[in-house]
């Protein structure tokens, strides 16, 4: 194996490993989107009511999004979190202090919730099903797992290529990484579109802002790394095979 191809193969493996770590981290963390809102009082019955509804199995899209808006919420692919006062006083309002302890509470999306239809008017089950938002939501959490699976399968093929001391099988690894990159890009695009459509339905309250979090950024960075790894794998395998064929033809001649 020529040193050029070996170097390209090693660089592609490093890029693949980094993108896999980034993708796994983005899937497993809860900071795809973050809301910033003023700190809420820790003494109102409204706080308790919102928290109880947030953790309820019957919480609909509008219910938990209202809590996310109000309590500095963060959303991942599998969990939603809010920041609430650590010590809630339901019996009487304590005196207002400059600051008080807060704690982050998270609730996981169930599989039923992941596949649940989205409605044209969030929270209103009689408003009809919003097919676009429904399928965007499903794609945004399925595609990252498909991407991760494709990269792992590509890594197995790359390992076999190392054992066989041949770069030719890495063409398949490159193609799988290309597909993984497309899945990651598709997931990111679906997430952005879904968030924009949601905010058109549920406008953010005053003094509340939202921004994409670092989990989302990891997924965004993972996609170009997958494309670069794919290009290096395919180039190394194809060029090495071409030079081997020319050398073999030269020897025969």
From Swiss-Prot:
Does Disulfide bond count among this protein's keywords? no
Give the membrane topology, semicolon-separated if more than one.
Multi-pass membrane protein
Q: State a single Pfam family of this protein.
A: Claudin_2
TM regions (residue ranges): 5-25, 141-161, 175-195, 216-236
List the carbohydrate attachment sites: 42, 72
Its GO CC terms are: apical plasma membrane; cell surface
Q: Where in the cell is it found?
A: Cell junction, Tight junction; Cell membrane
Q: Which Gene3D superfamilies is this protein grouped with?
A: 1.20.140.150
Q: Does the keyword Glycosyltransferase apply?
A: no
Keywords, comma-separated and alphabetical: Cell junction, Cell membrane, Glycoprotein, Membrane, Tight junction, Transmembrane, Transmembrane helix
Which cysteines are disulphide-bonded? none
Task: Enumerate the InterPro entries for this protein.
Answer: CLDN1, PMP22/EMP/MP20/Claudin
The organs and tissues expressing this protein are described as: Widely distributed in the adult CNS with highest expression in the corpus callosum, caudate nucleus, cerebral cortex, medulla, putamen, spinal cord, substantia nigra and subthalamic nucleus. Weak expression was detected in the adult heart.
Q: What is known of its domains?
A: The C-terminal region is required for localization to tight junctions which occurs in a TJP1/ZO1-independent manner.
Task: Please report which protein family the annotation says this sequence is part of.
Answer: Belongs to the PMP-22/EMP/MP20 family.
Functional note: Plays a role in negatively regulating the permeability of cells to small molecules.
Protein name stated in the entry: Claudin domain-containing protein 1
The species is: Homo sapiens (Human)
What gene makes this protein?
A: CLDND1
């Amino acid at each position: 194996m020529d040193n050029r191809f070996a170097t390209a193969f090693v660089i592609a493996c490093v890029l693949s490993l980094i993108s896999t770590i980034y993708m796994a981290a983005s899937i497993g963390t809860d900071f795809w989107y973050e809301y910033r809102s003023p700190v809420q009082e820790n003494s109102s019955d409204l706080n308790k009511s919102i928290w109880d509804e947030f953790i309820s199995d019957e919480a609909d899209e509008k219910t938990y999004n209202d809590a996310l808006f109000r309590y500095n919420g963060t959303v991942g692919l599998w969990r939603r979190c809010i920041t609430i006062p650590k010590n809630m006083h339901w019996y009487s309002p304590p005196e207002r202090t400059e600051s008080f302890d807060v704690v982050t509470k998270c609730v996981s999306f169930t599989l039923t919730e992941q596949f649940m239809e989205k409605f044209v008017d969030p929270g209103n089950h009689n408003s009809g099903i919003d097919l676009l938002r429904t399928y965007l939501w499903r794609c945004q959490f399925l595609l990252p797992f498909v991407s991760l699976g494709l990269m792992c399968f590509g890594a197995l093929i790359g390992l076999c290529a190392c054992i066989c001391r041949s770069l030719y099988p890495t063409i398949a690894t490159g193609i799988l990484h290309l597909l993984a990159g497309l899945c990651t890009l598709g997931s990111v695009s679906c997430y952005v579109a879904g968030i924009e459509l949601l905010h058109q339905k549920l406008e953010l309250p005053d003094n509340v802002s939202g921004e994409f979090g670092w989990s989302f950024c990891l997924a965004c960075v993972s996609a170009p790394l997958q494309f670069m790894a794919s290009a290096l794998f395919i180039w190394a395998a194809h060029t090495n095979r071409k030079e081997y064929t020319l050398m073999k033809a030269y020897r025969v001649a």
